Amino acid sequence: MATTMASCGIGSRCAFAGAQLSSVKPQNNQLLGVGGAHGEARLTMRKATGRKSVAASIDSPWYGPDRVMYLGPFSGEPPSYLTGEFPGDYGWDTAGLSADPETFAKNRELEVIHSRWAMLGALGCVFPELLARNGVKFGEAVWFKAGAQIFSEGGLDYLGSPQLIHAQSILAIWACQVILMGAIEGYRVAGGPLGEVTDPIYPGGNFDPLGLADDPDAFADVKVKEIKNGRLAMFSMFGFFVQAIVTGKGPIENLADHLADPVNNNAWAYATNFVPGK
């Protein structure tokens, strides 16, 4: 769905909209459900955007009660609260992390945002090494060593240009990161200009310059691809961190070493010989 989903306690702050819920106006929002636990009333709100729900708009193997499950035909019955409404729902929640609607909404947002960072991070870890191995000169192509160049005698030339002197100061870099990223995240979480209510996970507008959300059916499919690749990227980044600690090499060099000598360069061989600090 390309609509805003939020679970809010009456008179409380909505975690997604970031604004006080003082009244419900049918012309602006649709009331999807009223429920609660332990005597607490809970409203589920969605901004009316004119887009149909995923289940109603497409016959997709990734959504609905007949969607693909985590173990295929051997998966068994999914929990009642996993209905296949959202992308990436394979009916698996042994820890019950999605049982509470508010916790589920928060975890959905965290997963998607971290997935996007992981996809960008994985690309940033791999691409410089690939370029360096193909003749492109870098001061330091290995991802976990590159940042330390700012403390070297010559400093760090951003984009290879010594004219960009702000890159020579770690404080200036930190300030730029806080201001720029803070502004973007604030825009996303607060709901855009003038407090307009938007979905913080899929805000659209200027965040969708290619118009990927214009077609609801195609957008539903893109969201599944995003979360699947994002989960893979998060596992990849975890692997890159472990490689950096154990081998002291980047992912491309580790891959090349493994392909050259798979018997001696593999996870089992390193795990059995690894001594912290050496």
Swiss-Prot record:
Photoregulated by reversible phosphorylation of its threonine residues. GO terms for cellular component: chloroplast thylakoid membrane; photosystem I; photosystem II. Residues 1-45 form a transit peptide. It is a multi-pass membrane protein. It is found in: Plastid, Chloroplast thylakoid membrane. Chlorophyll b 3 binds at residues 169, 185. The LHC complex consists of chlorophyll a-b binding proteins. The N-terminus of the protein extends into the stroma where it is involved with adhesion of granal membranes and post-translational modifications; both are believed to mediate the distribution of excitation energy between photosystems I and II. PANTHER family: CHLOROPHYLL A/B BINDING PROTEIN. This is Chlorophyll a-b binding protein 1A, chloroplastic. It comes from Pyrus pyrifolia (Chinese pear).
